[in-house]
Design a protein with these regions (language model features):
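Glycosyltransferase catalytic domains, chiefly GT-A lineage
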Residues: 2-511
Length: 511
């Protein structure tokens, strides 16, 4: 009897649709079995199945399966979107590479969990023990430029009045042209004009007087907090000054987010970094302010003989003595900078800057037209340098007269035109006609020198979205920088209307 009851139950649980009912009635025997079941109560008490029972089972199972399938499809969709995001950042396609935002929270999350392919890195051939590195005696003497001095005040205007005080001064086109004519003794614009801003506290001025070896960095407009370097030897800790240049906004931000200690001389510290406050920011644009300590390191710290600049979002991984030995002393260089990972031509770099909205598109075009008019060709293997475009996040220098002159001329271009310093580097090299010798090392070594941390927030300004010069008229005039980039608004002594920029053919990934 039990087997008779179990048989229709098993059939019911393993079949669908009308088969349930037909099999059930075909196998059910109208005998006392129903009474026996009836006495037991439960779902069998009626002697037959409820008419809607099979459909309930079907709907329940179907709903569960639907939820599972929908969940799987949703997970696959999310995975596909994330994979596409990572792939777009690695793509050499113009369209897809523009979509990528390496500073987004999604990208940083994927990078943190190891889903983003590691940057191209290679071992750096450094001396194993910093304690054994021999530091050269004396200074490197230049053969061409032996003495350099700086313009500190602008010439009076034609009516005898003084022009407004600007950090970079009011360099004329004639003065700019003259600055590229090399002689043994030169006087050039190099920032820090009288009453132009970027003032240091007296306590910091006194401190840096004792700094011969410098690791410098900078944070402006509160975009980062200091990252402590790793693998620093005891010798380097004693030898180097680690100087973090900040503006007032960043100092307040740092104090609110990390521990800042004050020594007995009122010096402010975050770990190994001595904070150097620059009061009275010289520019409206925070990115342009950051070029002051980056390019004019020799002006901020005039007693320094050697300096290593690293961007504020970077964590240094290699001992600074090993860096100086590898990139300067071993090859008898006085200036070293990394090759850009993707671009060799400044026109390709300018194209990438426009696509990624790093500055106003028409102003980048104007900047490049001036350079092309003045003879700056696209990079080719015929050039003596391996690239016209550097990775400017790390700069290694001995502060010789020629190295200092190059830094001044480079800064003057950044001051006159767009704040994108990578666009001006190769131009200054070109104008010096081979007199400035430098070491441009492989990008894979550059990526092995540091860990790159994301900014605390993304940078954005209205000027970056400008597509036409007409947008600067009327209410848009407020987007014009009032203290930098004035060369973009000063009539140029040449016909730029006839200039057609070289066509950019993208053969590499976007940087």
């Amino acid at each position: 009897m039990e087997s008779d009851v179990q048989r229709p139950v098993s059939l019911l649980l393993n079949r669908r649709g009308g088969d349930y009912r037909s099999d059930f009635h075909n196998n059910q025997t109208p005998s006392n079995n129903s009474k026996d079941v009836e006495g037991g109560g439960g779902s069998f008490s009626s002697g037959k199945w409820p008419s809607d029972y099979p459909m309930k089972i079907i709907w329940k199972r179907g709903f569960v399966r639907l939820v599972l399938v929908a969940g799987i499809l949703w997970m696959l969709l999310i995975l596909a979107v994330l994979s596409f995001h990572v792939w777009s950042c690695q793509s050499s396609s113009v369209f897809f590479s523009v979509i990528c935002n390496k500073e987004s929270k999604v990208y940083n999350f994927l990078n943190t969990w190891g889903f983003v392919p590691e940057q191209h890195r290679c071992p750096i051939p450094v001396v194993g023990n910093p304690e054994r590195i021999v530091i050269p005696e004396g200074r490197t003497h230049d053969q061409i430029v032996k003495n350099i001095s700086y313009v500190m005040e602008d010439e009076p205007l034609k009516d005898g009045s003084q022009s407004s005080q600007l950090f970079g001064g009011h360099q004329s086109w004639k003065q700019r042209e003259k600055s590229f004519n090399l002689s043994s003794s030169m006087k050039v614009h190099c920032g820090f004009m009288h009453n132009g801003g970027a003032d240091m506290d007296l306590v910091d001025i006194e401190y840096v007087k004792n700094c011969r070896f410098v690791v410098a960095s900078g944070i402006f407009d509160g975009y980062d907090v200091p990252h402590q370097p790793s693998n620093i030897s005891d010798r380097s800790k004693k030898l180097f000054c680690f100087l973090m240049v900040v503006d007032e906004i960043s100092l307040d931000f740092i104090k609110a987010n990390v521990t800042v200690r004050e020594d007995h001389n009122r010096g402010q510290w975050v770990g190994i970094w001595r904070l150097i406050l620059l009061k009275h920011s010289p520019y409206d644009e925070p990115r342009r302010n950051g070029k002051v300590p980056k390019i004019l390191t020799h002006r901020l710290f005039p007693q320094a003989q050697y300096s290593i600049w690293i961007d504020g979002k970077m964590e240094l991984l290699v001992d600074p003595l090993q860096i100086l030995e590898r990139y300067l002393w071993r090859g008898k260089n006085t200036f070293a900078i990394a090759q850009h990972k993707h671009h060799r031509s400044i026109y390709e770099e300018a194209d990438a800057n426009k696509r990624r909205k790093r500055y106003a598109r028409p102003l980048i075009d104007l900047h490049m037209k001036i350079y092309y008019y003045e003879g700056m060709e696209s990079w080719s293997p015929k050039k003596s340098s391996v690239s016209d475009v550097p990775e400017g996040a790390i700069i290694i220098r001995e502060h010789t007269a020629m190295s200092n002159l190059f830094s001044c001329l480079w800064f003057n271009e950044v001051n006159l035109f767009t704040p994108r310093d990578q666009l001006s580097f190769g131009y200054v090299v070109y104008r010096l006609g081979g007199a400035f010798r430098f070491f441009m090392f492989p990008n894979c070594e550059y990526n092995s020198l540091f860990v790159l941390h994301p900014h605390t927030r993304e940078h954005s300004s209205k000027v970056e979205w400008v597509k036409s010069l007409s947008e600067f008229k009327g209410n848009g005039s407020s987007m014009k920088e009032s203290r930098g980039g004035l060369g973009l608004w000063t009539p140029y002594p040449g016909d730029l209307n006839s200039v057609a920029l070289p066509k950019v053919v993208r053969a590499s990934k976007a940087g």
